[in-house]
Amino acid sequence: MSATEHTDIVVIGLGVVGLSTAAALARRGNSVVGVDRWGSGHPATSSTGASRSIRVAYDDERYVRLALDAFAGWRRLEASQDVELLVQTGQVDLGPEPKLGALAAAMRATDVRFDELDAAGVGRRFPELAVGPGERGLFHAEGGTVLADAAMGALTADATDAGAELSMPERCTAIEVAPDEVEVVTERRTLRAARVVVAAGPWSGEMLRAAGVEVSLAPAVAQVTFLDAPQLLDRPGIVDWLLDGGVGVYGHPVPGVGYKVAFDAGSTEPWLPDVEAWPPDLGEQDGLVAWLGRRMPAVEPRVALTQRHPWTMTPDGDFAIGRRDPLVVAAGCSGHAFKFGPALGELVADVADGVARDELDLFSLDRPALRTGHASPSTPISR
């Protein structure tokens, strides 16, 4: 018979959100046990890989404020763990007026400095970029790259330093909700806790459903490509919103690896819970090379590496964060949560503690999109 242990809070899933949450809760004096089926950096997980983009250019002030909090959180983590986590190159957003106007309005309202550029201005400042007469650009300095592998190591150390017990790999097999506590059954033991945070990425929907909580989540398979393009390694990150309203493209430099580019949507290929790796989609890779030829025609598109990993979409692309006592949901990261890691950890910890936050309306489990919408793996990310 497996052992039974008692703790204040169990965190299921130790990706960027789970680790950040475990650290935040432990710092507040809670006893915390975190478990993860795979372990940090495993290719089956959403938080794997060398890098993620970081930016404050969002079309909602709440996201901008959360991104600014995250920047400060990453800097504190760099100092406490004595490791470089951010490469701040700035970011340029390209696209039509309606989208860029919304980004500018949200940044202006939160006192973020940025430069607005017409097509000629983009060409002068960023000569590697080809832009059309109907396009504009926004540049802000608070953009660049999170060194994701290093960040996961730093977050693991931070949570452990705060007193959290982290167990990887340890698979959760059941969540059993009782009137005054929750039992989390793993392949090794039974954990009894007052609260449980479910931050299990694409496995979250199935876990929550089995515990009686329904959230519209769609696991998806995402793909990223790294280009061997040394001339871009000191250039800013880019988000291309595209004039035709199609799926956008983002890119950013990754020291020692290459220039990372990806479409901002998941694949239609089904995600399966026991698959550990996916072969590259060469058609998608060719599409990125074609985009590069249009946007950066002087850059020779030499592909260094293509990787795939899962993520989890909501119907509207906003996160699913909230409480269904005694469960705390931290899911539906929709392909753009990593940058917010430390800030999301504090936010989810506030949810667990019953603290009100403005951002919670945006991520509410009761918002119409989650109650009546249908999440799709290939939903383009509009954020």
Where are these regions (language model features)?
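Flavin (FAD/FMN) cofactor-binding and adjacent substrate-gating region
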Residues: 94-162, 167-168, 174-179
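C-terminal catalytic lobe of FAD-dependent flavoproteins
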Residues: 294-383
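Beta1/beta-strand and adjacent pyrophosphate-binding region of the FAD-binding site
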Residues: 3-17
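Active-site substrate-recognition segment that forms the wall
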Residues: 23-27, 84-86, 202-325
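Conserved beta-strand-loop-beta-strand element in the redox core of flavoprotein oxidoreductases
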Residues: 173-191
